[in-house]
Design a protein with these regions (language model features):
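Bacterial N-terminal signal peptides
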Residues: 10-16
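Mature extracellular/passenger domains of Gram-negative fimbrial/pilin and adhesin proteins
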Residues: 2-6, 19-205
């Protein structure tokens, strides 16, 4: 018994030594910048925007869509849907920046659909099944929410007069996207309430 135990101990020590021999130390360096950019959002028809810049809520009405008009599970077609033409007014805070990215955080919202990871999962207050919410870019392509795909737009500059008649440069951007219900999974969809929540962040470069 003692010999067997020594053999096991020796093997364990040898394994530990090899593990240490293969170990290596390193450093991860993080680089970034905190910008002063603070853009307020206004929305187009079908959207209601509330709250102050930096903490705004956008309510979108997707309307009433019949089951037989839902897009397929691949998300290649848009069933009705609502355009979200978001206009960003950044004032003078966009100096030195060229691009704004709309990044989504579905996990902090109602989640990612279990049958199609490109889609937003319906919330717990929903009674419809077999349906998710798709976000489309201006090119009509379905975004993959689980892959952190973004909606990007240039940050445009324009010269205006301030209250004293001096020229100032102000910045704005237009983020054009569309939201729609999409069939999810192989099972037949059922009718009912279909709500979802999708937190977002505006990132500037």
């Amino acid at each position: 018994v003692s010999i067997s135990m020594k053999s096991i101990l020796a093997a364990a020590v040898a394994s530990l030594v090899v593990g240490n021999a293969m170990a290596a130390d390193g450093t991860i360096n993080f680089k970034g910048e905190i910008t002063a950019a603070a853009c307020s959002i206004t929305g187009g028809a079908g959207t209601t925007v509330g709250g102050a810049a930096g903490n705004q809520t956008i309510d979108v009405s997707l309307g009433k869509i019949s089951i037989d008009s839902l897009g397929g599970t691949a998300g290649g077609s848009i069933a009705g849907g609502t355009s979200l033409n978001l206009n960003l007014d950044c004032g003078k805070t966009g100096t030195g920046l060229t691009t704004v990215k709309l990044k989504f955080d579905p996990v902090s919202g109602t989640g990612i659909d279990s049958h199609n990871e490109s889609l937003l999962k319906l919330g717990k207050d929903s009674t419809a099944t077999g349906v998710g919410i798709g976000i489309y870019g201006s090119d009509g392509k379905l975004l993959n929410l689980s892959a952190n795909e973004t909606i990007n737009a240039p940050l445009n500059s324009n010269t205006e007069k301030d209250g004293e008649g001096n020229d100032i440069t102000v910045y704005s951007a237009n983020l054009n996207l569309r939201a729609a219900y999409v069939k999810s999974g192989a099972a037949a969809a059922t009718a009912g309430i279909a709500n979802g929540s999708l937190p977002f962040t505006l990132e500037y470069n």
